[in-house]
């Protein structure tokens, strides 16, 4: 059965989901909702449908898989991952998954708040000042492992790739994105299914954010 992923026509919160669908070879189709032109960016392409899909909490992204209808990006990731035993196996692995999942969301939201803020240029120096420390924490958490939980991929690696790739785009010369974090990014991009997806016309690297953001709000 083909699942349907619904989201705006941007990278955003759907990026890790798309990567996981591709990696697991899950048959899927996308409903990419488009905003109207500036300055209003009319969202009616989505709002006209949102109450008609049978979602408990109508929002984007959503995933429809037969009778299963989910919103919340991490709930969607976990649903896909459970089908493929990618949520950690031991209790310690599951703990690492849970901690990193929530920590990465904190990092993602802090970056989004910066990029959507009208004071972007004023706030950017403080963000850049604290970023190296955050990346060093992730580097220590990864350690010498191949993946963030151990030797086997879990869904948090897809989240981590997305978050780290955004920072790499934002600060290309960041020293803290070298070493094991750089190796992690390269290792992830070298995965056969991921590499093929990134070379395909389906892949969307940008825009990361909605059109009102002050950074990375346009297609490349």
Curated annotation (Swiss-Prot):
The keyword Transferase applies. Substrate binds at residue 116. It holds the Pfam family GST_N. Its main location: cytoplasm. Glutathione binds at residues 7-8, 43-46, 50, 59-60, 72-73. Changing residue 108 to E: Reduced affinity for glutathione. Gene3D superfamilies: 1.20.1050.10, Glutaredoxin. Changing residue 210 to H/I/P: Reduced catalytic activity. GO terms for biological process: glutathione metabolic process; lipid metabolic process. GO terms for cellular component: cytoplasm. Disulfide bonds: none annotated. Its EC number is 2.5.1.18. Residues 90-208 form the GST C-terminal domain. Keywords: Cytoplasm, Lipid metabolism, Transferase. InterPro entries: Glutathione-S-Trfase_C-like, Glutathione-S-Trfase_C_sf, Glutathione_S-Trfase, Glutathione_S-Trfase_N, GST_C, GST_mu, GST_superfamily, Thioredoxin-like_sf. PANTHER family: GLUTATHIONE S-TRANSFERASE, GLUTATHIONE S-TRANSFERASE MU 3. Conjugation of reduced glutathione to a wide number of exogenous and endogenous hydrophobic electrophiles. Participates in the formation of novel hepoxilin regioisomers. Belongs to the GST superfamily. Mu family. Homodimer. This is Glutathione S-transferase 2. The gene is GSTM2.
């Amino acid at each position: 059965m083909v699942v349907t992923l619904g989201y705006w026509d941007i990278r955003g919160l759907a990026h890790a989901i798309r990567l996981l669908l591709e990696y697991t070879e899950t048959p899927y189709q996308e409903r990419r909702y488009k905003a109207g032109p500036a300055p209003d960016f009319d969202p009616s392409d989505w709002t006209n449908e949102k109450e008609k899909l049978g979602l408990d909490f109508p929002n984007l992204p959503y995933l429809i898989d037969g009778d299963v209808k989910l919103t919340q990006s991490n709930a969607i990731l976990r649903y896909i991952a459970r089908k493929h035993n990618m949520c950690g196996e031991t209790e310690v692995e599951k703990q690492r998954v849970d901690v990193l999942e929530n920590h990465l969301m904190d990092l993602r939201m802090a970056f989004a708040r910066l990029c959507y803020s009208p004071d972007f240029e004023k706030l950017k120096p403080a963000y850049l000042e604290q970023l190296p420390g955050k990346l060093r924490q992730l580097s220590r958490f990864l350690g010498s492992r191949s993946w963030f939980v151990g030797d086997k991929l879990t869904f948090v690696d897809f989240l981590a790739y997305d978050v780290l790739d955004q920072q790499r785009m934002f600060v290309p010369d960041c020293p803290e994105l070298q070493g094991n974090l750089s190796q992690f990014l390269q290792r992830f991009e070298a995965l056969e299914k991921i590499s093929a997806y990134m070379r395909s016309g389906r892949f969307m690297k940008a825009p990361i954010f909605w059109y009102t953001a002050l950074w990375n709000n346009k297609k490349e």
